[in-house]
Amino acid sequence: MPAIVIVGAQWGDEGKGKATDLLGGRVDYVVKPNGGNNAGHTVVVGGEKYELKLLPAGILSPNAIPIIGNGCVVNLEALFQEIDGLEARGADTSRLRVSANAHLVAPYHQVLDKVTERFLGSRAIGTTGRGIGPAYMDKVARLGIRVQDVFDESILRQKVEGSLRQKNELLVKVYNRRDIIADEIVEYFLSFAERLRPLVIDSTLELNNALDEGKVVLMEGGQATFLDVDHGTYPFVTSSNPTAGGASVGSGIGPTRISRSIGIIKAYTTRVGAGPFPTELFDEMGVYLQKTGGEFGVNTGRPRRCGWYDAVLARHASRVNGFTDYFVTKLDVLTGIEQIPVCVAYDVDGVRHDEMPMTQTEFHHAVPIFEYFDGWTEDITGARTLEDLPENARNYVLALEKLSGTRFSAIGVGPDRDQTIVVHDLIND
């Protein structure tokens, strides 16, 4: 069987965890191909809410093998804290595997992340402060430490010492912080070796063998399209490629083996941290969406910025990722709103743009051009088909589908996995 990739189509927090959980019972592997413990997602199973950060949502699917892929950066302390938290609630985490080639987040990465954000002041990106960016910087600079290095103390020490030569210069001379002792970092990593060893595999080989055997592999992208370091609203982005192409790189599964590219998109739009957001609301309606939608970060608790659905973003995300399907989430949050605006194009200095402006400056100047749709007051959380939806809710969904350029195959009408309208099967249709 070919592989399936799930990608956020906005700025994150679209409900990728729900989509993965919904499909998890029908797949054999769930892979996290990028990111670290900076991108939290919430999964609701049987009324129980689970907030996951580093672990793939597939950890809650009893028949799927969850894998942290080679494109991830792993904070070992956070990993085992998350595992322990799930096990304390009765979850089985014994199937979890970690790629030997995944990079590690060191304590000094977290220090650098926080002091750099403070140093930037008003120009700060708004990172989570968890060291993800600095870990990816080391990976690209060939200074990174990988999971496999924890099992070879000589290599580990050599890499830590090499990395700290540069970082201590920066910490002491620029940020006026004390230097970091290499021995302490080596001991920190070695303390996890015994517990880590049984989890580590050659994930590329494992996944490709599974596909050869006819098994189904689901790749669960972290963050989202417009946080992609290449395709996002640079520089207000993450440090990896959370697009469909990045999922291929971060898992070791070749692009020709991917049959479905599924975009996860909210029925409105949210964003955390700094950066442009054309449809952002600064009034009571923004607060209403925030409170009704529970729009607070899983990792940081920060309130998410809220705005209306942006079809320009949806079309661009579909193009960049080659989406075959959209899974729309949180339609129920819009219940009770009299009129719902949808951004169909931008006005940039008097010129209409139906597609994403080419430059960062133009996007910062983009003013949304709205079309308006009548809302609905009926409770839709029990809807399981399009026909179950009130007429205005159905019209809204069909309009978004047409504007977004990709078929809507599933629609979330509540937080639980079964509160979903499935229009087209996401694996076989």
Curated annotation (Swiss-Prot):
Mg(2+) binds at residues 13, 40. The active site is at residues 13, 41. Substrate binds at residues 298-304. SUPFAM superfamilies: P-loop containing nucleoside triphosphate hydrolases. It catalyses: IMP + L-aspartate + GTP = N(6)-(1,2-dicarboxyethyl)-AMP + GDP + phosphate + 2 H(+). NCBIfam families: PRK01117.1, purA. It comes from Paenarthrobacter aurescens (strain TC1). SMART domains: Adenylsucc_synt (SM00788). This is Adenylosuccinate synthetase. PANTHER family: ADENYLOSUCCINATE SYNTHETASE (PTHR11846:SF0). GTP binds at residues 12-18, 40-42, 304, 330-332, 412-414. Pathway: Purine metabolism; AMP biosynthesis via de novo pathway; AMP from IMP: step 1/2. Belongs to the adenylosuccinate synthetase family. IMP binds at residues 13-16, 38-41, 128, 142, 223, 238, 302. It holds the Pfam family Adenylsucc_synt. Plays an important role in the de novo pathway of purine nucleotide biosynthesis. Catalyzes the first committed step in the biosynthesis of AMP from IMP. InterPro entries: Adenylosuccin_syn_GTP-bd, Adenylosuccin_syn_Lys_AS, Adenylosuccinate_synth_dom1, Adenylosuccinate_synth_dom2, Adenylosuccinate_synth_dom3, Adenylosuccinate_synthetase, P-loop_NTPase.
